[in-house]
Amino acid sequence: MSRPNIPTAEQEYDEIKVPGRDGNLYRKKGTLKDIPIEITYNFLSDDPEDWAEDFRSIKRRFLKESTGMLMFSDDPGYYYKVKKIDIGTNERLAKRIGKFQVTFTCEGYMYLIEGAETRNLSDTLYNAFEECKPVYEIAGDGVCTLTVNGTEVTANIGGKLVIDLSL
């Protein structure tokens, strides 16, 4: 098997038709479309009689983990956020060998594994790539001011405050 091809996420646009104008105008929405990542898997059963049961077991494992992170060993430190998983038809190549395709529907961005870690509020993480949409979990009591990309937010916290910028 070979490493899968990873598609580039497409920008989303509003299409504007103006009467009397050649062509259309496009306005960026500031969002990306989901990307499908297709991976071909194969498996070898110990016994030909176990072939179908082995595939059912593999399907259960994929479907149990239908969301989460998709990482590749040749691109350490990064992952894709999986939104759904579709499992294709199991092809029997030989009595004990099966092959099937899994399509992972992922968000259009790649994420740093380091960015998913909890950090102290005084820490700064510089993202040299795409715009990020972090989740802030702030614990404590009192007034807190959070500045992100030049935008300042002040909140009175009484225990715990969660700010999810991906919503």
Model feature map: region roles:
Residues 42, 71, 103-105, 137, ...:
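Generic structural detector for well-ordered beta-strands
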Residues 53-63:
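Short amphipathic alpha-helices in soluble, non-transmembrane regions
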Residues 47-49, 77-81, 143-146:
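Short, surface-exposed beta-strand/loop "edge" segments at domain boundaries and coil↔beta transitions
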Residues 24-49, 96-109:
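Oligomerization/assembly interface segments of phage tail-like spikes and tubes
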Residues 110-167:
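Intrinsically disordered, low-complexity segments enriched in serine, threonine, and glycine
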Residues 64-110, 114-115:
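Short beta-strand and beta-hairpin "edge-sheet" elements
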Residues 1-36, 76-90:
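Solvent-exposed edge beta-strands and adjacent loop segments
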